Structure formats: C-alpha cells, structure tokens
Amino acid sequence: SILENIIYSTKNISFEKVVDAAKAVGVHDYIMELPNKYETQLEQRGENLSIGQRQLISFARAIVRDSKIIILDEATANIDSYTEMQIQNALKVLLEGRTALVIAHRLATIRGADKIIVLQNGEIIEQDTHENLIKNKGLYYSLSSLNYSSFDDIPDHIIKKITGESSST
C-alpha cells in the first residue's frame, strides 16, 4: 500500500507523521482522492502511479525516515512542467537541513544548491553557487543563458560552440 511504501523500514512511526510528510511534499491531496486512500495497493514498482507521484511518495518516505543524506538522480526527468513545479516545491521541503547529491540536467533542479559542480567530459570545470557561477560567465552561465530547461534540450551544435569542441567528426 501507499502507507507501507512511505513507512518502509521505519519503526514506530505514527500515521500523523506520515500524513504530515505527505502534506509537506504535496502528495496528500492526491492520496486522499484514491478510493482506498493510504491503503491503496501499489503495483510492482508503483506502475499504477505517475513518475511524479512516485517521486513525491519517495520524498515523503525520506522525510518520515528523517534521512540526513539524499541522493537524487534526475529527479525532474521525464515529467511535464506542472509536475516539475510540484517536485521543485517538494524538493525545497525535502532538502531543507539535509545533505544532498543531486544529479540533474534541468538547471531549475539545482539552482538553490549550496554548491553546484559542473562536469565536462568527466572532469570538474566549475564549482560554486548558482549566483557565482552566473557571475563567472563560464560554461554554467552559457548553458543557463540559453534559457533551456534541460541540458538535454540543447542542440549538439550549440554545446560544441559553447565548449569549444570541434564541429567536425
């Protein structure tokens, strides 16, 4: 069930804390619309939920567990703009006071990070806050100034121009 998923490997947690966590990440109202609410059975790997709903439920689980370290790999990949906004809001709650390693192509996902590390060909080429990386006008600035929501949306020829890679193959 959704409840079992949220409290997975957590002992002695009250239902009230589960509801508080679900509300904090914005998934409670959705759960309450389901016929069996928190007792709704989930299919294998949550197949009967959208990607965004699965993300939000996993965020609620991390809050219930009081996880101190969070690892997110493309938390906002393969979702629509509305769901991305929900997840961005949930991330603010989830990451507050926690250490996080966030792998992201969408700049909005990492904008509020204490430190952003920019990799190119597996090497660190920049690291700082969003504001300082913008001021430094390096690769991060170039990519963000293109106003793409995702690095994946940027055509290869533009990336090659920004990074100075040769256009010929």
For the regions a protein language model found, what residue spans apply to each?
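Hydrophobic anchor residue at the start of the ABC signature
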Residues: 59, 103
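Catalytic Walker B motif of ABC-type/P-loop ATPase nucleotide-binding domains
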Residues: 70-74
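Helix N-cap at the start of a conserved alpha-helix in ABC-type nucleotide-binding domains
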Residues: 81-82
